Curated annotation (Swiss-Prot):
Lineage summary: Bacteria, Bacillati, Bacillota, Clostridia, Thermoanaerobacterales
Cofactor(s) for this UniProt protein: Mg(2+)
Enzyme Commission number(s) from the entry: 6.1.1.6
Classification via PANTHER family: LYSINE--TRNA LIGASE, CHLOROPLASTIC_MITOCHONDRIAL, LYSYL-TRNA SYNTHETASE
Quaternary structure and partners: Homodimer.
Organism of provenance: Caldanaerobacter subterraneus subsp. tengcongensis (strain DSM 15242 / JCM 11007 / NBRC 100824 / MB4)
Gene designation per UniProt: lysS
A Pfam cross-reference name: tRNA_anti-codon
Reaction equations catalysed: tRNA(Lys) + L-lysine + ATP = L-lysyl-tRNA(Lys) + AMP + diphosphate
Entry's cofactor comment: Binds 3 Mg(2+) ions per subunit.
Protein name: Lysine--tRNA ligase
Cellular compartment(s): Cytoplasm
Gene Ontology CC: cytosol
InterPro entries: Aa-tRNA-synt_II, aa-tRNA-synth_II, aa-tRNA-synth_II/BPL/LPL, Lys-tRNA-ligase_II, Lys-tRNA-ligase_II_bac/euk, Lys-tRNA-ligase_II_N, Lys-tRNA-synth_II_C, NA-bd_OB-fold
Binding site residues for Mg(2+) 2: 416
Length: 499
């Protein structure tokens, strides 16, 4: 047997012994009349941060705190421990003479991970450590698992994602990411509410999967005896509300796409979509750059952020460039001079790009070349405008060039962070595009848009000129927290079950 295998077996044996000892201590405590799960409520006077941030006003005063034991050091008839609450850690000092013999024996039975409530006076040790001199304590919960403190934190990414509850206890930086995530979403709402937008909720279960090119999750409604889809976007219901007279609406909600997983994709994720009547995609550009700058300033204190070692300046205005011009700038090919689909496909092959289907149209090739060869170069915030109509079934055509649409995507660090249109409000054009998508679907494209007759009917009632915007909230949080993977900003990311 190799040394590494022997070490693994030894670690498992040691862990099993530690778990056995914890359950033994549980039984000992119960034999002493202590029920480790018996207290329903514990009143605190303060949090650790209150005392550490305002020591002068707390010195010598009696306080009551609660938290999880994170370190524990015994020296005969005196012990020190650190307890952790939601705001941080604080040291406690437990002395035999202060708490009594029985209580001190109980304290000696406690382990790292146990949750206790303490009452005592605030003082500083000789080394200057702010400490609670405990006069009384109560065991609020006995932990039967061993926290990985001996390895100075939980390091295995897979285990961190599966046991986020342990990750949050052990790694303070992880807690900060999710606290900041909450602040980011609050700042988004604040920004939009201040501009007169109305937050709404729309259905999660759809009879037609629409609003994006993505494979849906399918479920079955027993009472109606029909298959339904978990939503892949928020778009079509929100635009129905624009038709209904709500001129500024937004929703922040979960959407679900039955697709692959990587550092930027999780099957369920949080999406912001907003729609505003009587504006266009230029208005959405201004709103997007202002929103990003507002959130960065609110959460990080600056419109300049550091992402993966690169400084990103979110200060408006951002660079604006058409997709065709971006390809010309970074690849050296001018698609304005390409006349036919066949010529476009040849260019893709010459660039060693794999065609997704043999009959790809010029607009689809343009999007392919951009995705594969240009996107990665867009490090500083950039609006890429005027997408081909073939890849934009819900966007309005440009009047001066109907082969392209009034659509943009925003890119930061080579990644798409926002997608917006001047929304298509011509019901006849929309139906024709749905029919084309339907033909693609029948030809085997599972991501092609389904026909939505009710949405066509809504457009026939009449939708005013409208600008729409979608922002992946998780990706926004990644940038604002300098997180490498989307799994680092989702509390419980999708994971394959262990065998």
């Amino acid at each position: 047997m190799s040394n590494s295998n022997e070490n693994i077996l030894n670690d498992l044996e040691n862990l099993n012994e530690l778990l056995r000892v914890r359950r033994e201590k549980l039984n000992i405590l119960r034999s002493m009349g202590i029920e480790p799960y018996g207290i329903d409520r514990f009143e605190r006077t303060n949090l650790s941060s209150d005392i550490k941030n305002d020591y002068e006003n707390f010195e010598g005063k009696t306080v009551t705190l609660a938290g999880r034991i994170m370190t524990k050091r015994s020296h005969g008839k005196a012990s020190f421990a650190d307890i952790q609450d939601r705001d941080g850690r604080i040291q406690i000092y437990v002395r035999y003479d202060n708490v009594g013999g029985k209580n001190y024996e109980i304290f000696k039975l406690l382990d790292i991970g146990d949750i206790i409530g303490v009452t005592g006076e605030v003082f500083k040790t000789k080394t200057g450590e702010i400490t609670i001199n405990v006069k009384d304590f109560k065991l609020l919960c006995k932990s039967l698992q061993v926290l990985p403190e001996k390895w100075h934190g939980l390091k295995d990414p897979d285990l961190r994602y599966r046991q986020r509850y342990v990750d949050l206890i052990i790694n303070p930086s992880v807690r900060e990411v999710f606290l900041k995530r909450t602040k980011i979403i609050k700042a988004i709402r604040e920004f939009l509410d201040n501009r007169g937008f109305l937050e709404v909720e729309t259905p999660v279960l759809h009879t037609i999967a629409g609003g994006a090119a993505a494979r849906p999750f399918i479920t079955h409604h027993n009472a109606l005896d029909i298959d339904m889809y978990l939503r892949i976007a928020l778009e079509l219901h929100l635009k129905r509300l624009i038709v209904g007279g709500f001129e500024k609406v937004y929703e922040i909600g979960r959407v679900f796409r039955n697709e692959g997983m990587d550092i930027r994709h999780n099957p369920e994720f949080t999406l912001l979509e907003l729609y505003e009547a009587y504006t266009d995609y230029h208005g959405m550009m201004e709103l997007t750059e202002q929103l990003f700058a507002y959130v960065a300033e609110k959460v990080n204190g600056s419109t300049k952020i550091i992402y993966q070692g690169t400084e990103i300046d979110l200060t408006p205005p951002w660079k604006r460039i058409t997709m065709v011009d971006a390809i010309k700038e970074y690849v050296g090919i001018d698609f304005e001079k390409v006349a036919t689909d066949e010529e476009a496909r040849k260019i893709a092959k010459d660039l060693n790009l794999e065609l997704k289907k043999p009959d790809m149209k010029k607009g689809e090739v343009i999007a392919l070349v951009f995705d594969e060869l240009v996107e990665k170069h867009l490090i500083q915030p950039t609006f890429v405008m005027d997408y081909p109509v073939e890849v934009s079934p819900l966007a309005k055509r440009k009047r001066d060039n109907p082969a392209f649409t009034s659509r943009f995507e925003a890119f930061i660090y080579g990644r798409e962070v926002a997608n917006a249109f001047s929304e298509l409000n011509d019901p006849i054009d929309q139906k024709e595009r749905f029919l084309e998508q339907l033909r693609q679907r029948e030809a085997g494209d599972e991501e092609a848009h389904m026909m939505d007759e009710d949405f066509i009917n809504a457009l026939e009632v009449g939708m005013p000129p409208t600008g729409g915007l979608g922002i992946g909230v998780d990706r926004l949080v990644m940038f604002m927290t300098d997180s490498y993977s989307i799994r680092d900003v989702i509390l419980f990311p999708t994971m394959k079950p262990k065998d």
